[in-house]
Amino acid sequence: MTPWVLRTRYQKLVITGATNVKVYRKHIRNKDAFVFLGYVESKELEFLHKNAYAFVFPSLNEGFGYPPVQSMRYGVPVAASGTTSIPEVCGDAVLYFDPYSVSEIKNRMVQLLDTEIYDEYAARAPKRYVEVHTRQIADLEEAVNFILKV
């Protein structure tokens, strides 16, 4: 489950991912502030990455941590879980939180409403994307060269 905050005049928290949304809707006080999309196809996912005000990634079990990097490509600031591989992949371009702490997640989201913090992480985001992407290309070239030599 991934929350998105779209760049609109009245921001909404957009949540994607295959999940039982009825459980969440039942406990939400301000239902108009949330949009549950469930699973989305890659084109819609790309639209969300590109048009988000911020990307919040409370993952507990991420193998590589690529979703935050996808948002960084577009200069979208990210708040993400400080667990698994995410800090290794995202470096200092992300505001980290404990994914088990609702108050930490909320505090990071509120921090991104501060213009200075927002601008700082919006500037870091595409730089980190380029670093990760460049490293991936170099690793792929190395693997291809190794295979071709065998």
Language-model-detected regions and their locations in the chain:
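Carbohydrate transferase catalytic cores enriched for Leloir-type hexosyltransferases
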Residues: M1-V150
